């Protein structure tokens, strides 16, 4: 992934000697393989739908940073899967950067015009800090994962 936030996350994982997965899309004008991705875990896709399938399949949470059409496509795909309960696992969906997203997305208008339900606005969380994102993710995971020492 890259450039920007995705590249920084991958570089951080690499610097910490952690494994990380690269799910690249072959495009004529961008997205060369990130040199910090774990080589055996670097995959290239021709079709967007296959790339999105794998990142949703592997993810426990998705944090979406400001981006363009591809970012919006990924956000709405994940949100649709969560809304329609096509995912059989909980998924914390986070929009990072409230001021950006409030200008780009007017989901309240969709509620006003009846194209989405007001409850759909609860399918994701908008945040401005790492601490807010972390608290939301851990809260979502605690809803479904047993706590240490708990019996099943």
Question: What residue spans do the PLM features occupy?
Answer:
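Acidic/glycine-enriched connector segments
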Residues: 4-64
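Active-site/ligand-binding-proximal alpha/beta "capping" segment
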Residues: 46-95, 143-145
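Gly/Ser/Thr-rich loops at beta-strand to alpha-helix junctions
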Residues: 1-6, 69-71
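Alpha-helical elements of the RecA-like P-loop NTPase motor core of helicases
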Residues: 7, 73, 134-135
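Short, solvent-exposed amphipathic alpha-helical segments in soluble enzyme
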Residues: 14-15, 77-82, 109-112, 141-142
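Short acidic, glycine/serine/threonine-rich loops at helix termini
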Residues: 10-12, 33-35, 74-77, 105-107
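Short, acidic/small-residue loops that bind anionic groups at enzyme active sites
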Residues: 19-30, 65, 79-103, 118-119
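C-terminal functional extensions of proteins
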Residues: 95-152
């Amino acid at each position: 992934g890259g450039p920007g936030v995705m590249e920084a996350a991958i570089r951080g994982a690499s610097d910490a000697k952690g494994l990380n997965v690269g799910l690249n899309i072959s495009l004529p004008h961008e997205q060369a393989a990130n040199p910090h991705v774990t080589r055996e875990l670097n995959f290239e896709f021709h079709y967007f739908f296959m790339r999105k399938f794998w990142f949703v399949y592997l993810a426990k949470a998705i944090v979406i940073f400001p981006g363009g059409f591809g970012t919006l496509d990924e956000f709405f795909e994940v949100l649709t899967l969560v809304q329609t309960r096509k995912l059989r696992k909980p998924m914390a969906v986070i929009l990072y950067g409230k001021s950006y997203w409030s200008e780009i997305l007017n989901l309240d208008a969709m509620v006003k015009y009846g194209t989405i339900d007001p409850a759909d606005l609860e399918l994701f969380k908008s945040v401005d800090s790492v601490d807010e994102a972390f608290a939301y993710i851990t809260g979502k995971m605690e809803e479904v994962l047993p706590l240490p020492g708990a019996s099943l």
